[in-house]
Amino acid sequence: MEMKIAGLTFGYSNIEVLKDLWIDFSGAQLISILGPNGVGKSTLIGCICNILQPKSGAVYIDGTSVRDIPVKELAKMIGYVPVSTSDSFPMIVVDAVLMGRHPHSKWKVEEEDLKKVYDVLVRLEIDDLAMRNFNELSAGQHQKVSLARGLVQEPRILLLDEPTSNLDIRHQIEVTRILKDLSREKDMLIIMISHDINIATAYSDNVLLMYEGGIYAAGNPWDVITKDSIRTVYGVDCDIVDYKGRPRVILDQTIANHKATDWVPPYTEEHHPTLMKRGD
């Protein structure tokens, strides 16, 4: 499976949020999108899954623009789990998760659908919630149920907007590890937005660092997460240490005077990276 983002530009009114993005993705892997608030991370996810329509450029899956793929077929190819949900389902958790099977089974529930649901609930350690009312769950439990719904959809590409934001640190680590494992087991490209740099770099095959509506850097975590990139993008000083073969950010107390007013996104049609699965 290959996905290509070609010259993607998006804006609200006269304000450009994404500016001429170029990047390719190839193979099953876990990719984390990093960057401060307001740089276009969620907007990029929205354009990939065709919720938002770019002003120019396009997103291609195996050579076909997502705008040209019928909605039902696109739902089988791309799953999307938003950062938070205002969903209010007067139903039990099993039924809420079963909604993710709709692109495959429509509204007829088969035994195989139920098995897939329970397998995912067990994997996410929420099988004890199966018969609970969805509306009675905590924010963190809601988030895991929403993730379960995305996983049972079994898409080729799964897009997650801060899937661990309401979870405690143990479950943040556990969910991120599960996502990496599932990318291998299900031959799936999983792209998640994260604000935890250290957890993201510990488990991601590649990372994409966004800044000012563009891609500051993308690739191997060691190539992307550097003292200079953290200083420029986040405006803080730090040290980078090697922890079990992965970069770990140790923050300084200093707020850096970093504003790069002349920064230009480095990737173009002629020169942009292809993010491929790394060797474990």
Q: Would you name each region that the model predicts?
A:
Residues 49:
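Helix-to-loop junction immediately C-terminal to a conserved catalytic motif
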Residues 233-280:
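ABC ATPase nucleotide-binding domains
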Residues 98, 111-129, 154:
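Conserved ABC ATPase "signature" region
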Residues 158-162:
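Catalytic Walker B motif of ABC-type/P-loop ATPase nucleotide-binding domains
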Residues 34-36:
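The feature captures the beta-strand-to-loop junction immediately N-terminal to the Walker
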